[in-house]
Curated annotation (Swiss-Prot):
PROSITE patterns listed in its UniProt record: HSP70_1, HSP70_2, HSP70_3
Keyword Endoplasmic reticulum attributed: no
Name the record gives this protein: Chaperone protein DnaK
Keyword ATP-binding included in the entry's annotation: yes
Keywords, ordered alphabetically: ATP-binding, Chaperone, Nucleotide-binding, Phosphoprotein, Stress response
Phosphothreonine sites (modified residues): T198
Gene3D superfamilies in the cross-refs: 1.20.1270.10, 3.30.420.40, Actin, Chain A, domain 4 (3.90.640.10), Substrate Binding Domain Of DNAk, Chain A, domain 1 (2.60.34.10)
Stated role: Acts as a chaperone.
């Protein structure tokens, strides 16, 4: 059985880990890094780049470089958060045919699940090259506060990447697994997870291998990206005051600002001051303009204090739902790159009244937890039981647009709940069941997950038919709903596919796309390698011809020159096979030249049969002669 891997699919960075015996191991990618930027880019000629190579060219190719796409996954185009996101990114966010938010590059539309799949493919390849075998199954993490549509879209991304997603696991829960696996003592912990794009807080009880989530809360649109944008806006405002130019209108300058802001933010976690230096950031009639600015930690903290403050309310609600006070928390575990910021640590300490635990690597701990859960599913990790919860209440719309809850938030999953409803009018023969997720009292204020019709109800006075609605939430937090007319036994069941979302045909098409992309990438690599070999041979043959061409016969020299010309022509094409064939032909034709070179070399060594030491002495003598000449 092939290994099941654990993947932390992050907003800013992703990470992959696997169980090696009894302990989890984070796997380094092809670039030698333990985390991979969650960035996908397309070059002008359509080549796809993922991770660090994509990040490196982001400044010069902002419109085709997709970052923080996790913020769009499972969201509708007219969602207010998407509206906000469109203003923050240099790439195009567009409305898909199904009403979802997608992205566009050179007229081709991609779903956020597809972009995420390209990142997952990279993680899959990273694991495969380390393990030396094919990987087909994975555990993938999501923010605890992700709704059903976002979880389903993440599962779809795995499928597009060629992975069977055995389990979707919440990020704070994964972190708790990694933190508590080898600890013998029991206790109550809070996991404070502030990542690149999302914030979660979970309260768990740990003891005897049982990890029980008591409550969870969060904000799926709050993270490091927002901290970066605060700094970008501050720098742009200061520059505008000074130079009268708004850098936000220039996509290239905006991307440079974003990179500088991220770098400054990271530096200010360890230094109290940093300098931002961006020469030639823009130009006007008077010439080029440079941005140089000193930034103190105190100034940065003042710019983002309200963002950190926003994380405190979910912490308060999570404690309230768990029925605990801050003093009853034994340990606070910090997760996510943003928790390296001293001000974040300080505010967490103030809120919980204790020094937070910094013994886990905030960038890797979630992937490690996913690998442990993969080990549990594989049977390699024994005596570990994970009891997670659903983050949001689930229910249906009833008379007057009221949201009637069937399953309350923080209910342990998997779970199943049924309730009987009736018709609202006399003679009603069909009922539309509209399914919502959220905490507001009116259905319209919550997130609609989908709707379906139960038809063929025998006509009867209002209130007489009995319709039983059953909600079923699996261990991934994904919902199935069925409705049954108890009179006729007629049943209608759906796996909630978000009002948008990808259907099976979409996913199949994207799987094929991903496979053809992988094939294209292989072709590109083969072409690049063929050109490298060909160009190297052209160079060495030309050099050899100029130095030793007189040592072979005219016919042989003509054959070499002809093969050389043919290879040069082939190198101007995109045909890898033709280049390889012509490279082979030139190598064959040059054999005689190689022989002539070797025999000339050996012939030169015959007289006096000089030793190596003498050769070195001769070099020194030449230098001395030069010195005498110049004297």
């Amino acid at each position: 059985m092939s290994k099941i891997i654990g993947i932390d699919l992050g907003t800013t960075n992703s990470c992959v880990a696997v169980m090696e015996g009894a302990s989890p191991k984070v796997i380094e990618n092809a670039e030698g890094a333990r985390t991979t930027p969650s960035i996908v880019a397309f070059t002008e000629d359509g080549e796809r780049l993922v991770g660090q190579p994509a990040k490196r060219q982001g400044v010069t190719n902002p419109e085709r470089t997709f970052f923080a796409v996790k913020r769009l996954i499972g969201r509708r185009y007219d969602d207010p958060t998407v509206e906000k996101d469109k203003k923050l990114v240099p790439y195009k966010v567009v409305r898909a045919d199904n009403g979802d938010a997608w992205v566009e590059s050179d007229g081709k539309k991609y779903s956020p699940s597809q972009i995420s799949a390209f990142i997952l493919q990279k993680m899959k390849e990273t694991a495969e090259s380390f393990l030396g075998e094919k990987v087909e199954k994975a555990v993938i993490t999501v923010p605890a506060y992700f709704n059903d549509a976002q979880r389903q879209a993440t599962k779809d991304a795995g499928r597009i990447a060629g992975l069977e997603v055995l389990r979707i696991i919440n990020e704070p829960t994964a972190a708790a697994l990694a933190y508590g696996l080898d600890k013998k003592n029991s206790g109550t912990i809070a996991v404070y997870d502030l990542g690149g794009g999302t914030f979660d807080v979970s309260v768990l009880e740990i003891g005897d291998g049982v990890f029980e989530v008591k409550s969870t809360n969060g904000d799926t649109f709050l993270g490091g990206e927002d901290f970066d944008m605060r700094l970008v806006n501050y720098l742009a405002d200061e520059f505008k005051k000074e130079q009268g130019i708004d850098l936000r209108n220039d996509k290239l300058a905006l991307q440079r600002l974003k990179e500088a802001a991220e770098k400054a933010k990271i530096e200010l976690s360890s230094a109290t001051q940093t300098e931002i230096n961006l020469p030639f950031i823009t130009a006007d009639a008077s010439g080029p303009k440079h941005l140089t600015m000193k930034l103190t930690r105190a100034k940065f903290e003042a710019l983002v204090e309200d963002l950190i403050q926003r994380t405190m309310e979910p912490c308060r609600l999570a404690l309230k739902d768990a029925g605990l006070s801050a003093g009853q928390i034994d340990e606070v575990v910090l997760v996510g790159g943003m928790t390296r910021m001293p001000k974040v640590q300080e505010m967490v300490k103030q809120f919980f009244g204790k020094e937070p635990h910094k013994g886990v690597n905030p960038d890797e701990v979630v992937a490690i937890g996913a690998a442990i859960q993969a080990g549990v599913l594989q049977g390699d990790v024994k005596d570990v039981l994970l009891l997670d919860v659903t983050p949001l209440s689930l229910g249906i719309e009833t008379l007057g647009g009221v949201f009637t809850r069937l399953i309350d938030r923080n209910t342990t999953i998997p779970t199943k709940k049924s309730q009987v409803f009736s018709t609202a009018e006399d003679g009603q023969t069909a009922v539309t069941i509209r399914v919502f997720q959220g905490e507001r009292e009116m259905a319209a204020d919550n997130k609609i997950l989908g709707q379906f019709d139960l038809v063929g109800i025998p006509p009867a006075p209002r209130g007489v038919p009995q319709i039983e609605v059953t909600f079923d939430i699996d261990a991934n937090g994904i919902v199935q709903v069925s409705a049954k007319d108890k009179g006729t036994g007629k049943e209608q069941q759906i796996r909630i596919q978000a009002s948008g979302g990808l259907n099976d045909a979409d996913i199949e098409k994207m799987v094929k796309d991903a496979e053809s992309h992988a094939a294209d990438d292989k072709k590109r690599r083969a072409l690049a390698e063929a050109k490298n070999h060909g160009e190297a041979l052209v160079h060495s043959t030309e050099k050899a011809l100029s130095e030793h061409g007189d040592k072979v016969g005219a016919a042989e020299k003509g054959a070499i020159e002809s093969a050389l010309g043919e290879l040069k022509t082939a190198l101007t094409t995109e045909d890898a096979e033709a280049i390889q064939a012509k490279t082979q032909a030139l190598a064959q034709a040059s054999l005689k030249l190689g022989e002539a070179m070797y025999s000339a070399q050996q012939g030169g060594e015959q007289p006096g049969a000089a030793k190596k030491d003498d050769v070195v002495d001769a070099e020194f003598t030449e230098v001395d002669d030069d010195k005498k000449k110049s004297a």
